[in-house]
Amino acid sequence: MSRVCQVTGKRPMVGNNRSHAKNSTRRRFLPNLQNHRFWLENEKRFVQLRISTKGMRIIDKKGIEVVIAELRARGEKV
């Protein structure tokens, strides 16, 4: 399973660790992904999404039905 938010599309990005001596080594910045179950009232079932915490805030703002409709319009299986 890839580390990609299903709502926002956030992915890991790369950067550098910086020591006190300014040495740099490559590292990855991972998104804060959570597996979360949401109840769909109109379908009478749970859906499990792998979403970032920003994706959770978007769902709180728009509502889960609207977000699921947008995912299905993009062709993502939910």
Curated annotation (Swiss-Prot):
GO terms for cellular component: cytosolic large ribosomal subunit. Residues 1-23 are annotated as: Disordered. Pfam families: Ribosomal_L28 (PF00830). InterPro entries: Ribosomal_bL28 (IPR026569), Ribosomal_bL28/bL31-like_sf (IPR034704), Ribosomal_bL28_bact-type (IPR001383), Ribosomal_bL28_sf (IPR037147). Keywords: Ribonucleoprotein, Ribosomal protein. GO terms for molecular function: structural constituent of ribosome. Belongs to the bacterial ribosomal protein bL28 family. This is Large ribosomal subunit protein bL28. The gene is rpmB.
